[in-house]
Regions:
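Transmembrane alpha-helices and adjacent helix-loop boundaries
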Residues: 1-298
Length: 298
């Protein structure tokens, strides 16, 4: 590794790690919003991934590379169990139900000594690194990009626009909803495992209501037009506190104002603005090329 890169990671390592982890969390929200669902269970799935991986490492002594895939399996199994009853709900009712599930898990973390209780778990081996985190983030973006441009992606878009119409066209709505929930759980669990193994500490308050809303804000700010958009939103909201560090207590106020403005005036997110401009330019160029000089109307 070049010395300058080593110095950069030593100085800004925590921020680089946060960019990757938050990018994965933004994708976990993207996949459920892509099918028109409002689930706020991503923080709960992240907590399951973090706690399961930390316990397997600390209590059982398992190596990180064995724990990493299992930290994805645990939240996926939980999502599979709770998905059947909760996916009967939609809109704000689904959001409330998933928040409730997250609070139940947080209460368990707080009150069970085996998982650290209110003090959390410390001394987790720091086995993850920036290259692994961002490599997995890039892989997730590529996979979701390909999915978005496949038959599955078109079905998801149809569900997001009009679930009833999509179902009438033969889209298996329940299957796609469950698939999106499981993918969301997998991505959030992966983010939890990576976060636990770079910070060496986890606590129950890291996976409550506030983190759930923050994850939602990643996708709202960036947009859900494609997988890159929510990652872009996550990076903006991750870097914003660093840029506003001098404002101290006003950082959260400014952060909230930016989210409100983005939702009101940028319904497709920040990433949608340049994409709309590019699309408009392409349409204008295409129209100009069709209008050949000297062509006479027929």
């Amino acid at each position: 590794m070049p010395s300058w890169l080593d110095d950069f990671l030593f100085t800004y390592g925590n921020l680089v790690h946060a960019l990757g982890v938050n990018g994965l969390l933004a994708l976990s929200m993207y996949v459920v919003l892509a099918v028109g669902q409002l689930s706020l269970g991503q923080a709960a799935f992240m907590g399951l991934g973090a706690y399961s991986s930390a316990l397997m490492t600390l209590k059982l002594g398992w190596p990180f590379w064995a724990v990493l895939p299992l930290s994805v399996v645990v939240p996926v199994l939980f999502a599979l169990a709770v998905g059947v009853p909760t996916l009967r709900l939609s809109g704000v009712y689904l959001a409330i139900a998933t928040i409730g599930l997250g609070e139940v898990l947080r209460s368990i973390y707080l009150n069970v000594d085996y998982v650290g209780g209110a003090l959390g778990l410390s001394g987790i081996p720091e086995r993850a690194n920036a290259f692994l985190i961002h490599g997995l983030l890039l892989l997730a973006v590529l996979v979701l990009w390909l999915v978005a441009r496949s038959r599955i992606g078109r079905a998801m878009e149809a569900m997001r626009e009009d679930e009833t119409a999509a179902e009438s066209m033969g889209v298996d709505v329940r299957r796609y909803k469950m698939g999106a929930l499981l993918a969301s759980a997998a991505l959030a669990g992966l983010a939890g495992c990576l976060s636990a193994h770079v910070s060496s500490f986890i606590g129950p308050n890291e996976y409550g209501f506030e983190p759930a809303v923050t994850i939602l804000s990643f996708a709202l700010l960036g947009g859900i037009g494609n997988p890159i958009a929510p990652v872009f939103g996550a990076w903006v909201l991750t870097l914003l506190p660093e840029l506003l560090r001098g404002l101290a207590d006003l950082r959260l106020v400014v952060n909230g104002l930016i989210i409100v403005v983005a939702v009101l005036f940028l319904p497709r997110g920040l990433f949608g603005v340049p994409m709309r401009r590019v699309a408009a330019r392409v349409r204008a160029d295409a129209g100009a090329s069709r209008a050949q000089p000297g062509a006479r109307p027929t």
